[in-house]
Amino acid sequence: MALPSCLKTGALMSPATGFNFSGSLMKSDSGFAVPTKLQSTRKGDRERLRVQAIFSFPPAFLTRNGRAEKQKQLKQELLEAIEPLERGATASPDDQLRIDQLARKVEAVNPTKEPLKSDLVNGKWELIYTTSASILQAKKPRFLRSITNYQSINVDTLKVQNMETWPFYNSVTGDIKPLNSKKVAVKLQVFKILGFIPIKAPDSARGELEITYVDEELRLSRGDKGNLFILKMFDPTYRIPL
C-alpha cells in the first residue's frame, strides 16, 4: 500500500482546508508553536503506526475466524427465514425476494470457489427451499405432495439423481457434464414412477445447474430457468446406483 505523499515529503495537509504547510510554524494543541518539520515527523510516525496496526491486526471479517463467523451468521439468517415457508410452498413474492437477497449474501462468502473440483458436492442432499413450481406442486392438496425431496450428485461418475418420498416415491436419474468449475449441463435419463416403474426421459429433459455455494452443511444452486435451490447435507456417503 502506497504511503500518503505527506509521509514521503514531510509536508502536511490540513484536513480542514486542504492546504499544505511546510517550513513555517504551526500551532499545536498545547498552545506552543512547534516547527513544522518536527510536527510533520511526529504526525508521520503516528500515521505509519496506524497503517502498521491495520495490517498487523486486520478487521475481524478479514481474518479466517472472522470469515467463518460471518458465514455462520449469514447461513443462520437464511435458514431462519426459510424455516416457516414449507420449502417455499407458502412463500409470497415478498418472501421469495427476501430469501433471494439473503441467499446472495451467503453466496458472496462461498468458501468453495470451484465446487465441481471438491468432494463437498458429493452425497445426498435434502431440499429445504426452492422457487421451482414443478417441484413444490403447491396447487396440489398437501397430502399429494412429496413430504421430502432429495438430490444426489456424484461428480466422479457424472451422475445426478432427484428423489421424492411419500406418497409416490418418484425419482429420476441423469448425467451431468461440467461446463466450468461451477456449472453443469444436466440430461435426465430415466424416471422411476412409484420407485420401480422405469420410463425413459424425453430428449427435452435437459437443463443447467450452477452451484453457487457449498460447504459441509449447506448447498445453494441456481438453475437455468432462474430457480433457486437450497439444500442441507443428509448423507455425504451416499452413492447413486450405476
Curated annotation (Swiss-Prot):
Signal peptide: none annotated. It holds the Pfam family PAP_fibrillin. Its main location: plastid. It comes from the Eukaryota. It is found in: Plastid, Chloroplast thylakoid. The keyword DNA damage does not apply. Disulfide bonds: none annotated. It comes from Arabidopsis thaliana (Mouse-ear cress). The keyword Repeat does not apply. Keywords: Chloroplast, Coiled coil, Plastid, Thylakoid, Transit peptide. Belongs to the PAP/fibrillin family. Residues 1-50 form a transit peptide. This is Probable plastid-lipid-associated protein 4, chloroplastic. The gene is PAP4. Residues 63-87 form a coiled coil. InterPro entries: PAP, PAP/fibrillin_dom. GO terms for cellular component: chloroplast; chloroplast thylakoid; chloroplast thylakoid membrane; cytosol; plastoglobule.
